[in-house]
């Protein structure tokens, strides 16, 4: 009987913590793309940002694309530091559903936000996205996105290199993590494409809808943009200031 009381007491002690952890998981901004924008942009809750990249062997990210992403994050957030780690893994798949992407992230991802550091997780996959084989990149949670490296290479054209496309796509997907365009807020600027929600109507913006599509070569003349335009930047500034 005494042993039973000890067990019951342990359950009663553990339950509040378990319930609190469950509550945090249910209300976490990481459940919805764009919902973590304030945690990413501001330094109030997380002063540092770390980018964890997991890639299929032989489909590693271009170093210049990663450096550019770091630069864009430094330019648009209040973070005191931005760091990167990379790890490869094997895969024999050639097509990935969203469920499979989530499962791969769960298996490969090592870090989640904690202490003073917010974590952005990026997957680099071979093959294609099962739901849309034209997809070059996809932001699918509040802190994660995937790039389809093989599709990016296939999208390269005479005047547009795979490296330039990758730079655009990686910054574009980061833009979705910080809620561009009009994802959960209403911009004071008329720059959302009515035919492509949450994308810019300006082909000189990295948030232009065609950036994450394999049709990019047919939609953009010359080198694709890899930076935010003035309307995008003003939206991000207003978010940081708590005005959006």
Spans of model-derived segments:
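Sec-dependent signal peptide recognition
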Residues: 2-9
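Residue-level marker of regulatory loop/turn positions in helix-turn-helix DNA-binding domains and
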Residues: 7, 43, 159, 163
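C-terminal motif of bacterial Sec signal peptides marking the signal peptidase cleavage site
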Residues: 14-17
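Propeptide-to-catalytic entry region of secreted or membrane-anchored zinc metalloproteases
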Residues: 19-129
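Sec-exported extracytoplasmic/periplasmic mature domains
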Residues: 74-82, 176-183, 238-244
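Active-site-proximal segment of zinc-dependent metalloprotease catalytic domains
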Residues: 114-188
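The catalytic-center signature of Zn2+-dependent metalloproteases
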Residues: 157-232
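Short, low-complexity, Pro/Ser/Thr/Gly-rich segments in the mature regions of secreted, periplasmic
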Residues: 226-244
């Amino acid at each position: 009987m005494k042993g039973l009381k000890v067990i019951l007491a342990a359950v009663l002690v553990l339950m509040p913590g378990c319930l609190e952890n469950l509550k945090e998981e249910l209300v976490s901004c990481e459940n919805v793309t764009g919902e973590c924008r304030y945690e990413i942009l501001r330094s109030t809750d997380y002063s540092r940002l770390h980018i964890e990249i997991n890639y299929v062997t032989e489909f590693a990210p271009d170093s210049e694309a990663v450096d550019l992403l770091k630069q864009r994050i430094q330019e648009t957030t209040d973070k005191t530091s931005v760091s990167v780690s990379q790890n490869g893994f094997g895969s024999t798949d050639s097509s990935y559903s969203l469920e499979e992407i989530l499962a791969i992230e769960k298996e490969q991802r090592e870090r989640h936000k904690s202490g003073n550091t917010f974590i952005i997780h990026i997957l680099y996959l071979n093959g294609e996205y099962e739901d849309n084989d034209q997809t070059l990149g996809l932001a699918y949670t509040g802190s994660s996105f995937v790039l389809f490296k093989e599709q990016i290479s296939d999208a390269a054209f005479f005047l547009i290199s795979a490296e330039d496309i990758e730079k655009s796509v990686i910054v574009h997907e980061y833009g979705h993590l910080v809620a561009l365009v009009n994802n959960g807020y209403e911009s004071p600027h008329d720059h959302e494409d009515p035919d492509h929600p949450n994308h810019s109507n300006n082909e000189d913006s990295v948030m232009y809808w065609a950036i994450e599509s394999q049709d990019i070569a047919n939609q953009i003349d010359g080198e694709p943009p890899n930076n935010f335009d003035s309307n995008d930047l003003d939206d991000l500034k207003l978010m940081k200031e708590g005005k959006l």
